[in-house]
Amino acid sequence: LHRSNIIYFMNGDPGHFGPNSMMWKVNKEITVLFGGARALLMHAAHPLIAAGARQTSFYQRDPWKRLIRTLSLQNSVTFGTIEEANDSATRINKLHEVINGEDEITGGYYDALDHEQLLWVHACLQLSSIYFYEKTVRKLTKEEKDTYHEENILSAKLVLIDIDKMPKTHEELKNWVVKKLSLIHISEPTRPFHI
């Protein structure tokens, strides 16, 4: 059990979602952690996300540190008390404030608080979690996927994604990612982290 699950049973704080939510049902599965690794590789293939990660030198020093932070945030937001979830999101948002600049490879501008870049990171993790859940547990109905997406909109809001500009359904989010894939490529600095 996540530490916060124990707190929930002790003090009745279900956090933002609670044990009957799709967020709990999907994210409690250990195999969903593989979704985090898949998402990390998708993040690294995005030239501007990779540029921001290079600025913090996560890829050079410890390529999995970013994954651990991302999964920690996902766990806190999903299973934590409201205070834990909000505090975790605030810490990440503070960290993101200083990650910005010009990508020396593409000339593009990266900004860890940019809506499109935040949405790419969020969408990759959300879709990868569903992907591994369906590969290892069971297929989800369209309604379940849409409920998971709707619940994820709150987690997106916590990390300052403009939810008014977010795709409204699971399928719309999936289509948005597919459309963005045409812009994605592996750059030399991130090649060591791809399979």
Which role fits each region the language model picked out?
Residues 75-78:
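Alpha-helical support elements that line or immediately flank enzyme active sites
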Residues 170-179:
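Small-residue-rich helix-loop
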Residues 184-195:
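Single conserved hydrophobic/aromatic residue that forms the stacking wall/gate
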Residues 131-147, 159-163:
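Inter-helical turn/loop segments and adjacent helix faces that build the functional surface
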Residues 1-33:
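Extreme N-terminal leader/anchor segments
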